[in-house]
Amino acid sequence: MLKSDFYKKFKQLSIALTAFGLSSLSLANDFQYHPSYAAFKQNAMQSYGLSAQQVDSAMSGTRNLPNIINIMNRPGESKPWYSYKTNFLAESTIQRGVRFKQQYAETLNRAEQQFGVPQAIILGILGVETGFGSNKGSFVTRDALATLGFGYERRAQYFQDELAALIAWSYRDGVATSSVVGSYAGAVGYPQFMPSNIPKFGVDYDGNGHIDLRNSAVDAIGSIANYLAQHGWQRNQPIAFPARYTGSNPDAVIAKDLTQPMPYGVLKTQGISPMNPIVKIDDLDLVNVIQLKE
């Protein structure tokens, strides 16, 4: 059965159930009819030691959320920092961050000392991702990942893998998959970790025996710091520094995609250099040039 045929039948089934007064799909696992479901289940069983019954049970009642596909298909938005910052630097957010820092001062200091990640960076991530926990998302994570894993062809395998990780996590921690909520793309908790990253980089920083990024700000602080440390964060190294440009075409050096940094040596030949001579940077260091002001 082709994927398009699957969704036609899925839609017809939804309409039929609604006609009988059922506002939501009630089959044990409607996604089991998708052509790739069997392979997904087999992969989940092999990767995490789950049984077929465990996978099917965790998927029971999963709902298709077609609006998520529409969100994913929207064109990406690229703004310079001076335009983008207004989304995050509202007075209410700043005050929420001040209160969060005061409340978790000891934990933030402990994480900085242990992992070498400055408190400001940890706070910045928490502020951007969830407004310091005030908005962790409202989509049922299982439903979001299933919708994307079986309906978003560009990254279907990635989201199926994350769905399998979610199911494994739910059994490991005794959490019902239907109770986990997060972003439309499946990210969870204060730091918006994808499910597969929770066992990889999550830290039980409050020492209660569980990694709980949904409810424990302390675990979230330690996990963010650990994540950055595991990804090569360099203690006491500069994060950013003012640069001087002596070339004639600034558009050629300003980063268009922050995921594609350039070696400093290349940018140096194009006229970029630190304004402060104390800053030491190697030609092989990967950097981005960003414009902070108009």
What name fits each language-model region?
Residues 1-160, 165-181, 186, 196-294:
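Cell-wall glycan-active module
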Residues 192:
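Functionally critical loop-and-helix segments that line ligand-binding/catalytic clefts
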